[in-house]
Amino acid sequence: MQDWDPDLYRQFEAERTRPATDLLAHITITSPQFISDLGCGPGNSTELLHRRFPDAQLVGIDHSQAMLASAQQRLPHCTFIEADIHQWRPSQPQNLIYANASLQWLTDHPHLFPSLLSQLAPRGVLAVQMPDNLDQPSHRAMREVAENGPWQQTLQEAGATRAKVLSANHYYDLLAPHAERVDIWRTTYYHPMPSAQAIVDWLRATGLRPYLAPLTEAMQLAFLQNYLAIIDKAYPARTDGRRLLAFPRLFIVAHAQR
């Protein structure tokens, strides 16, 4: 798959950063020494962490060279490394492992989440936020377009790139035996978008990537045209002309045992 596009991702940075801010607000530790930002992207979440904990040894981790370059330019005094989160092992037990909108791209959560929790220092915190929107009209439309067009065979596996997040009960059962406390909640954000095209532009940077990457440029344009037509109907204009994009997200904050 092609590398991520930081400029496209930042088009809706305020909306993308709001859940990161909400996740950070639920972290109660005061003076963490070691912090890792897993899937740091262009550094918007890392910047929040740096402002909150300026004295911590903070490392941003991502698999995208383009995102890491953007993050390093944004925060030249912070450390960023390229790594696969599945394979990542910190050199020190972490006081805070923070993962905003990244772990939903990874598989094998029953192994991954306990593994991340085991890499915390005593009283450390694992803080996770994941989009939980695969059943939303925006993502159902992706699958519908993929199944109805000349790209059908090419995109047979595109929908499998991102697995549906597990239930809150499942994550609790994975973490609770190894944690002092586990807090889980779900929030649905309603983003007023100026147009149906704006919704498509938002998703081009994230959810649509597995569908567009295997296609030729001409097929990408045709796919997006078909997708826009469905989005236009799925998100009708409200009284002020805007489209309301519902975006549910799952939050998990697990506190390591002492």
UniProtKB/Swiss-Prot annotation:
Task: Give the matching HAMAP family.
Answer: Tran_acon_Me_trans (MF_00560)
Origin organism is Yersinia pestis
UniProt KW Transferase keyword: yes
UniProt KW keywords: Cytoplasm, Methyltransferase, S-adenosyl-L-methionine, Transferase
Q: Would you identify the family this protein belongs to, as annotated?
A: Belongs to the methyltransferase superfamily. Tam family.
Q: What is this protein called?
A: Trans-aconitate 2-methyltransferase
Cellular component annotations (GO), alphabetically ordered:
cytoplasm
Major location (coarse): cytoplasm
Task: Report which gene this protein is encoded by.
Answer: tam
Query: Kind of enzyme, top EC level?
Result: transferase
